[in-house]
Regions:
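ATP-dependent carboxylate-amine ligase
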Residues: 1-141
Length: 141
């Protein structure tokens, strides 16, 4: 999906931008997140797929972009975003959590979100982040 907004029962707003991902599209989506109103701004970032040998460098670059985005919390999901997570930790960013796949993250994200949160979901379509959004919409109390 491309920039679809969904309001949860608990008052959190999700930004579903899970159709595709590149460094530039992640930057654009983060700019949108930063400009909008929200008590807490949270980014949930999945792998950018099909990068081959460039993957580690690009996912570290994503870490740099996230570090400079003044976010309240970051969640990374996938095998390649471990490089994003490592970059953030090495630069003393502590408000983050990494999951190897989306199935591990459902309950954690569901429990994390609160009224007023603005949450960006961004990653390659093959990362299935849209499944998390569907779960949250269906299971939010």
């Amino acid at each position: 999906n491309r920039l679809e907004f969904k309001k949860l029962k608990n008052g959190a707003t999700l930004i579903d931008d899970t159709y595709n991902a590149s460094l530039d599209s992640i930057k654009s989506s983060l700019e949108l997140l930063i400009k909008r109103e929200g008590k807490r701004k949270i980014a949930i970032i999945g792998d950018v797929l099909e990068l081959g040998t460039f993957s580690k460098n690009l996912h570290e670059e994503i870490g740099k972009v996230l570090l400079n985005s003044d976010l309240d919390y970051i969640i990374t999901i996938g095998n390649e975003t471990k490089y994003t997570d490592e970059y953030l930790k090495n630069n003393n960013y502590d408000n983050l959590k990494h999951f190897n796949n989306e199935n591990e993250s459902y309950e954690y994200i569901n429990n994390l979100l609160k009224d007023g949160d603005l949450v960006l979901f961004k990653g390659s379509h093959g990362m299935h982040l849209s499944n998390i959004i569907k779960y949250l919409v269906d299971n939010q109390k």
